[in-house]
């Protein structure tokens, strides 16, 4: 190897960040309306009933008991979100979910 090949190349210079203000101005000019936000696949859902909320709370409590997790407001919220996401994703339907949670994993 000759000495010129042994020399290290200088790292490439970093480009300066451009001013982001023009992007902010573009966002301010954007107009969003409800017609633009609604997609054909969007479905209207009714608010949950008190009975549904009570059932969700019971299922979350059972799940936490079965997994031996301390029942705190945070863990209850996470358990409820886990149950809702699994049902909405179609992983479990509500009757399978109830049986699984009540009988243990």
Curated annotation (Swiss-Prot):
Forms homodimers, homotrimers, and homotetramers via a C-terminal domain. Associates with XPO1 and with ZNF145. This is Endogenous retrovirus group K member 8 Rec protein. GO terms for molecular function: RNA binding. GO terms for cellular component: cytoplasm; nucleolus. A motif (Nuclear export signal) lies at residues 50-59. Residues 10-20 have a biased composition (Basic residues). Keywords: Cytoplasm, ERV, mRNA transport, Nucleus, RNA-binding, Transport, Transposable element. Retroviral replication requires the nuclear export and translation of unspliced, singly-spliced and multiply-spliced derivatives of the initial genomic transcript. Rec interacts with a highly structured RNA element (RcRE) present in the viral 3'LTR and recruits the cellular nuclear export machinery. This permits export to the cytoplasm of unspliced genomic or incompletely spliced subgenomic viral transcripts. It comes from Homo sapiens. Despite functional similarity, Rec shares almost no sequence homology with HIV-1 Rev and HTLV-1 Rex.
